[in-house]
Amino acid sequence: MNECIVIKCGGSMLERLDSTFFHCIEKLKRKYRIVIVHGGGPDIDKILKKLQIPIEKKHGLRVTSQEVMEVVQMVLCGSTNKNLVQNFQRYGLPAIGISGCDGKLLQAKPLNKKIGYVGEVSKVESSLLEGVLNLNYIPIIAPIGIGEEQVYNINADIAAAGIAAALRVKELIFITDVDGLLYEGKLVKKTDEIEILDMIEKEIITGGMIPKVQAALVALRMGIQSVSIVNGTKNFIGLTGEWIGTTVTRGRLQYE
């Protein structure tokens, strides 16, 4: 049986995924069983603005009232998820769209009451995913979690890391709009969590790259062996199957 990998697509990337991305997925499908986790921030913001519901974020997380939660669930589990499923199938990639609520796939508990109905993964029903994967489908997951009495908005990075850990995958891939981490103008092909923390402290890593590498560090601490940050608008698979981007591991490496 092929190894499994988890791929996280940020909400800001979904409308930019074109034939290049899907051809990469086609290549990966020959070697791996694939799980996709997606975000949907821009789509959610668009509906919130139309409904004149305030948008508030703290430390990169969406403050989620009951009113906001209803919109988040409607958008992520509805049009955002189904549009992505349609795009996969348009390229001949068999896909099934599901939310974390379905079959209690993503069980969640509240992260911090100050930010409302935002959750963290407490358990993943991995047998459900294994069943879908064994049927040769690509599960495309909307990161909504289910608690004892409430559904929760789960950050897509954290959901992807939780799913990757539950499936015991070796690799987690973050699809972004940048080539990876740059150091002195050159792409850092391989690095590790110690070097990442050092580069943040020295302000080598700044701006929008910080949350990307922080998400990678969280995933590594959950037991994933390596996390790669790649550019979804370009071919991100090398001739020998390596990732074209930045791969972060738990071991000690030197800059490459």
From Swiss-Prot:
Enzyme class: transferase
A molecular-function term among this protein's GO annotations: ATP binding
EC number: 2.7.2.8
Assigned keywords, A-Z: Amino-acid biosynthesis, Arginine biosynthesis, ATP-binding, Cytoplasm, Kinase, Nucleotide-binding, Transferase
Keyword Signal: no
Localization per record: Cytoplasm
Domain of life (superkingdom): Bacteria
First-listed, main subcellular location of the protein, grouped into a coarse class: cytoplasm
Enzymatic reactions: N-acetyl-L-glutamate + ATP = N-acetyl-L-glutamyl 5-phosphate + ADP
InterPro entries assigned to the protein according to its UniProt record, in alphabetical order: AceGlu_kinase-like_sf (IPR036393), AcgluKinase_fam (IPR004662), ArgB (IPR037528), Asp/Glu/Uridylate_kinase (IPR001048)
Pathway assignment: Amino-acid biosynthesis; L-arginine biosynthesis; N(2)-acetyl-L-ornithine from L-glutamate: step 2/4
Gene Ontology biological process: arginine biosynthetic process via ornithine; L-arginine biosynthetic process
Sequence positions that bind substrate: 40-41, 62, 153
Residues of the site described as Transition state stabilizer: 8, 212
CC per GO annotation: cytoplasm
Family (UniProt): Belongs to the acetylglutamate kinase family. ArgB subfamily.
UniProt cross-references to PANTHER family, sorted A to Z: N-ACETYLGLUTAMATE SYNTHASE, N-ACETYLGLUTAMATE SYNTHASE, MITOCHONDRIAL
Function in brief: Catalyzes the ATP-dependent phosphorylation of N-acetyl-L-glutamate.
The protein, known as: Acetylglutamate kinase
Organism: Bacillus cytotoxicus (strain DSM 22905 / CIP 110041 / 391-98 / NVH 391-98)
Taxonomic classification: Bacteria, Bacillati, Bacillota, Bacilli, Bacillales
Annotated gene: argB
